[in-house]
C-alpha cells in the first residue's frame, strides 16, 4: 500500500476529528455540519477499502499534524495574495469589436465568441487574469487578436454565473482554438497563458490540434441566433 495514501487517510481522520469537536461545541453552521456528515461516510468507506482502523489512523494523523505545526512559522500560515497578470492594455480590454459571422457558445460560466469570417490569419491569444498558488484563479478576459490588432474572438465570464476553474478556462480555450483553426488560422498564445492556462503548447506558443479534434471543437461552437 502506498505510504502517501495511508498518511493522507490518517491526516484526514484527525482533521475530521477536530471539525467534529468544533461541531460538538455548537459552532458549526449548516453547510459545515453537512460536509462533516458526508466526510464521515467517506472516511468509513476509505477505512474499509484500506483495511485501516479509523481511531488508530486518527492518532497517527494527530502526530503528523503536530510535527508539521512545530516546524511551521507564523509567516508560512499567511494566505498568499493573488497576483494579477495582464497581457492586454486597458484599451485592448475595453475596445468594442464586431463580427461578420458571429458564433457564440456558453460553456459553464464562460461565454466563448468568435468571428468565423476570419480565415488564413495568424492569431494571438491574450488574457488578463489572477493567479494564486501558481495556478489561474479567475479569468477577467481573454481575447484573440490578428497581427493587425483586430479582435476576432473572446472568452469572458458570465456575470450571472460566477465561478470557474482553471480547467474550465483551458477547455474554453480549446474550443476557441478549434473554431479558429478550422478556418486555417494559425493560433498562438501569450507566455502567461502558456504558463498558467494552457500547458499543452510547444515552445513558440503554437497550439496544434489534429484535424478530427478541430472538427469536433468547431462543431461545438453554436450560432448565437
Swiss-Prot record:
GO cellular component terms, semicolon-separated: host cell cytoplasm; host cell nucleus
Region CPSF4-binding: which residues?
175-210
Q: Which Gene3D superfamilies match?
A: Influenza virus non-structural protein, effector domain, S15/NS1, RNA-binding
Q: Where is this region: Disordered?
A: 204-225
Q: Where is this motif: Nuclear export signal?
A: 132-141
| Gene Ontology molecular-function annotations | protein serine/threonine kinase inhibitor activity; RNA binding
The listed locations are:
Host nucleus; Host cytoplasm
Question: Which purpose does this protein serve, as stated in its record?
Answer: Inhibits post-transcriptional processing of cellular pre-mRNA, by binding and inhibiting two cellular proteins that are required for the 3'-end processing of cellular pre-mRNAs: the 30 kDa cleavage and polyadenylation specificity factor/CPSF4 and the poly(A)-binding protein 2/PABPN1. In turn, unprocessed 3' end pre-mRNAs accumulate in the host nucleus and are no longer exported to the cytoplasm. Cellular protein synthesis is thereby shut off very early after virus infection.
> Anything noted about its domains?
The dsRNA-binding region is required for suppression of RNA silencing.
This protein's name: Non-structural protein 1
Organism for this UniProt entry:
Influenza A virus (strain A/Chicken/Hong Kong/YU22/2002 H5N1 genotype Z)
The gene is NS
Amino acid at each position: 500500500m502506498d505510504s502517501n495514501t495511508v498518511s493522507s487517510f490518517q491526516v484526514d481522520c484527525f482533521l475530521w476529528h477536530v471539525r467534529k469537536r468544533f461541531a460538538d461545541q455548537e459552532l458549526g453552521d449548516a453547510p459545515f455540519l453537512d460536509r462533516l456528515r458526508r466526510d464521515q461516510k467517506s472516511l468509513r468507506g476509505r477505512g474499509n477499502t484500506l483495511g485501516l482502523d479509523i481511531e488508530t489512523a486518527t492518532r497517527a494523523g494527530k502526530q503528523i499534524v503536530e510535527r508539521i505545526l512545530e516546524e511551521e512559522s507564523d509567516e508560512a500560515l499567511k494566505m498568499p495574495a493573488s497576483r494579477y497578470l495582464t497581457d492586454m492594455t486597458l484599451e485592448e480590454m475595453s475596445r468594442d469589436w464586431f463580427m461578420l459571422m458571429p458564433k457564440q457558445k456558453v460553456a459553464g460560466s464562460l461565454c466563448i465568441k468568435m468571428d468565423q469570417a476570419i480565415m488564413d490569419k495568424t492569431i494571438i491569444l491574450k488574457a488578463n487574469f489572477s493567479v494564486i498558488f501558481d495556478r489561474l484563479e479567475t479569468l477577467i478576459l481573454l481575447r484573440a487578436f490578428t497581427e493587425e490588432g483586430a479582435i476576432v474572438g473572446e472568452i469572458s465570464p458570465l456575470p450571472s454565473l460566477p465561478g470557474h476553474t482553471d480547467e474550465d478556462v483551458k477547455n474554453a480555450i480549446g474550443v476557441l482554438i478549434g473554431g479558429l483553426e478550422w478556418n486555417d488560422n494559425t493560433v498562438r498564445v501569450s507566455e502567461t497563458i502558456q504558463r498558467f492556462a494552457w500547458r499543452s503548447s510547444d515552445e513558440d506558443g503554437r497550439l496544434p490540434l489534429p484535424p478530427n479534434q478541430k472538427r469536433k471543437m468547431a462543431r461545438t461552437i453554436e450560432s448565437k441566433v
